[in-house]
Amino acid sequence: MFEKNGDTFLNGNLLIVGTTASGKSSLAIELARRRKNVEIISVDSMAIYRGMNIGTATPTVEEQEEIPHHVIDIVDPSDEFALPLFQSAVEKALKEISNRGNRAVLVGGTGLHVRAVVDRLEIPPRFLSIRDEIELIPETSFLYRKLNDLDPIASAKIEPGNRRRIVRALEVTLGTGRPFSSFGPGLDVYPPSPFTQIGIRTVSYTHLRAHETRHDLVCRLLLE
């Protein structure tokens, strides 16, 4: 597979996506072993945290010493690492890899984080003081009507009772002076991808057992 199609795959950077325990990381490592100019970037919302190795199938120390890995074990679980920071970390890794003349293989496990990188989502900033003021208003229905006045496109896509999303939309709209719906390409717009993409779909006894094994390990750690 790699010898036949490797040149096609690695004319640019490669993105491998798939379900939990589908073998994404193993495929990336095997590809990197066969092509010496490959470095791996994790696109997983949990792998960024230290100490999450079992729950996220983080590559072993030996694998990370053999093949350069990026955006893994970079913050503590108690630290906040918002999506824009994640985007910046991946973009920095991509630039450094390119400067070395190498190719990147991105391994994606979290849908939103993959999309933030691939589709270059524009993530609106947070405005905590504005949010605190909005939260002082108890009537969610009033907030929804206010959102509908300011950004009817956003309100049409948010359930009237979903206070968390309503507050966030108002926070961004009031804080930036732009409609919340103007951020990002939206769920129905897909710009050209800068990556060759491979999706792994595995539904088998072996896959189910791998998923169960991971689940058992996590449960055992929580109970100890």
PLM regions: where:
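Positively charged, low-complexity/disordered segments
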Residues: 210-224
